[in-house]
Amino acid sequence: LISTATVTQPMEYFFRNAGGDELLFVQAGDGVLESPLGDIAYRAHDYLIVPCGIAYRLQPRSKTELFVAECSGTVEIPEKFRNPFGQLKEHAPYYERDFRAPDLREPHDEQGEFEVRISARGRTAIHVMQNHPFDVVGWDGYCYPVAFNADDYAPVTGKLHQPPSTHVIFEAPGAAFILFAPRHFDYHPQAVPAPYNHASVDCDEIIYYASGNFMSRRGIEERSITLHAAGAVHGPQPGAVEASLGKTATDELAVAVDCFAPLRIAEPAFSIEDAGYFRSWVAVSKT
């Protein structure tokens, strides 16, 4: 389930996803993600990963805009970045110390009525607890929320164009999360920086445009979302390839999700659809 959310007020309830991990990308704003295991201060361009079954709430300090992916299982670091012992390899695009764990606060010793909304299998239940969910004196283990900032991602570059899968950042059952980060372009003397036309027959492609200039797209601005369904041929719009020649770098930041099961569009999305988007591939006549 992929959506966007805007948080302007502290959450008055606690939320627990019992169906899988949640991945929240912070487009704008700052604040604190609270959980029984402690607090994580977040800022713009943070990925917040909340494991399945962990209750949390957001306490924004400023208006917080989110791109949200509710997964059907665990969000993991791709296996190709890990050695047999789980340590990150040297070619991974980040380091263990780039991930921020919760800071355990003092136990919240309070009784009353505390609403916990639990989501699982397409349904939501409400539990009212007598004791505060954050009344925790300590914890142990490896299942806890983490934060990672996209600005700490070290993108892979190459002599020739790198396919999108090169820029994978996380994986989950049926999905690959990709980050198009600011980077140098291909450095072969005759390289064409713009991506080639392609049809991804195995997945639907979602891209959320966070910041910068995404060179292969026209009519895209910050917070735009595109969906290219499996099998639909797409690529640079007319003029984008020519405009990319000679470029040495990009400042784009875009969060992408490759979904390996067909996506169904929710009814509210149609009200904000750019019905003319497909026409952006029509060449503009010069007079």
Please identify what each model-predicted range represents:
Residues 1-287:
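Jelly-roll (double-stranded beta-helix
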